Amino acid sequence: MSLNLPNPSLIGILLVISTHSGPQLIYKYPFDLSNDPSRDESKYALDDNEDDELYDHEESEDENEVNENEMYGVNSRNWDSKHIDYYMGTKSDLLKFLDEQDSRRRKITTTSPSEEKHTKEKHGLTKTISKSSTMASSSTTSPPESSIQGEIFGTDAAYICEMLAPPKQMCNTRFEMTIQDKLFLGLPVHRSDNGQWRSIGHNNEHDEEETHTAKNSLNMFHLVFVMNPPVIESNYRVDEMFHYVISRLSLVLRYEQQKHDYVSQQVKNILALRESLEGNESLLTEKSSLSRVIRDCFEGISTSTIANLSINGKLRSFQIPIKTEFHSLPDPSVPFLPASYLSSTVELLGDTSFINVGETSRYGHAFNSVQDEENSAEKIIVYFALLLLDDPESIIKDMKTETDSTLAKFIRMIEPTESLLKLSARNSKLDISQIKDFAFHLIYWRRARVILPLSSRSVYIVSPMAPITIKLYDDISFFNRRFPTLPSLPHFLKLLSPQSRKPQQFATVIPSKDHRDRYLQALGWLIKHGYVTQLQTFIWLKISRKIKIKVEEDIENENLAKKKKKQKNGSVTVATANSSKTEAPIMPTDNTSKQVSDSKDSDKPEDDEYASKPRLDGLHEHIDGTPIVTLVQGDDTIILDPGRATTLERRWINKIIYEECKLSPELTAVFYKLLKYMNGKNSLELLLLKENISRSELRKLLLSIEEHIISVRHW
């Protein structure tokens, strides 16, 4: 298992209330929670040695008679790599799968070809795995009829309700309890002493809510999520569920209860329906709004999809974001979902809640990006483009928005070759703030992906995370149907990352200008499915030993010049004093003071020499204390943050610009625009858009300062 794979571990949802009569279980989904899934797994705990011997014996007998793929039930149709259960098998899943293989091999060797075909259609690997999913997908199938008041994992429902209805002091905060390896998680909402469900600042609303609460006796409601996460992932999965789903859904229900008495009315409706329908829970769910909310929430969250809930006539959506965005390559032992996107630009947007950055190490910590105010996601996203993950009309239909709404028009106008800033300029009716809101909305709800605008002048490579071993077989035929006039998928990927030469601009792959749009569409398809990522350029400013020596010599010469100037000024002062003494009338004075002053004047040059030594020593200390990276024995130095360069570092930079490279005023202006980005963290491809610099100007600058930069190209 890995934190990159979705695993909500949700096995049920309970609705518990507390009235003057005590706690009561109102509704639960699935209806039958009496069985313990861990007990069902025990029957598959066979002896490993016996199973291996049987497996090897039967395989040696049948391998020459029957096709191996058919014997194992593995082919391109039933090996559904797109299904989430494909990546979440457990030991019990594997044992069950091996049992299915045994029975399949026996039937293949004993049945006729017609019966064999029927057997293969009946037993599919996808069905086998999906029925034993760790995400409790068995619970999402049509459950048997059962009483809501029945046992919950072998424990009396009334006993569990007593524990799930905490006293008022423990309500309105996170609630977590473990019973028989099952974790009960929720946010119990209790009515305050003044009859309010939440603090209200206006007296009118206060009086209105008092009339609501006077009509019912509901004191507390608690929506409890029952989970069985893996032990090693327990804390992470529980926090994830509470943050994204439980806390938000409970607060929405509290709001509706405060404003419209929603929960109280639904509880009365459910109790009345339970009496009239005589245990027909499926019909109860269809007639109760809150029951449908609980059912839809379970079916959406347990399958790692988006739960679209209609709460009191308002559409609310909840999800646990999946991790398909990576800023660096994960370890080989860390699994991830196919079609994941690998790009350093994810790091710039990782400080928002809209992108859930993937883990690069097993059971590591979530990536936390620290960005300054200038590079915040709110400001920098306007320079990015959106890549829709589905057809525009399908997205509009799935989001249940009107076809002529502003959001629908925005979705239709999205082009992966245009940044959001250009979209705003192209449509005067949409301001940039509204476009950013729409963009974040599409990103969060898995309808679009943030990328740098596609360009034929950019360089693209095959992603190290490309799903070549998982989806390539199916995607080859799909790519050929989608782009019949283009090279095949393997050949297309070979053109992007050839073995004989370095990757070049995408324009070298396009045969002519007439093919440009079609090739860019194919490029967008490859990025969407995780096959391709953009190769970006990052640079550091390098200070050679030669530059440092010259700057140090300049500093020493300046100090010597200052010393000579002081000596000259001192001699002039002494001469002036002597002339004034000869012209002055002779007065009876004490010669002691004169001797002291003469001795001070004679000793002043020596004092200047001693004074210059601490300054030179301080210079060396400043050089040693500069935040730099030494490459080879202190010869060359990389400035880590040229945007906040020290005084000495600025002198190094000026020496490069004006004396070593002798840049023109135009290139000097471009250099200072890019100086703060020469830290190896910002790609030049993004800066071209951000600073409005042409590629020709950038190319001239890089050629001029080529000896003084270190360039690295990666995703």
Swiss-Prot record:
A GO BP entry: negative regulation of TORC1 signaling
- List GO terms (cellular component aspect): GATOR1 complex
Q: Where is the composition biased (Low complexity)?
A: 126-148
Keyword Signal in annotation: yes
The alphabetized UniProt keywords are: Meiosis, Signal
InterPro entries linked to this entry: HTH_NPRL3, Npr3
Compositional bias, Basic and acidic residues, is annotated for: 114-124, 610-621
What does the UniProt function comment say about this protein? Mediates inactivation of the TORC1 complex in response to amino acid starvation. Required for meiotic nuclear division.
Protein name stated in the entry: Nitrogen permease regulator 3
Which organism is this protein's natural source?
Candida albicans (strain SC5314 / ATCC MYA-2876) (Yeast)
Q: What is the lineage of its organism?
A: Eukaryota, Fungi, Dikarya, Ascomycota, Saccharomycotina
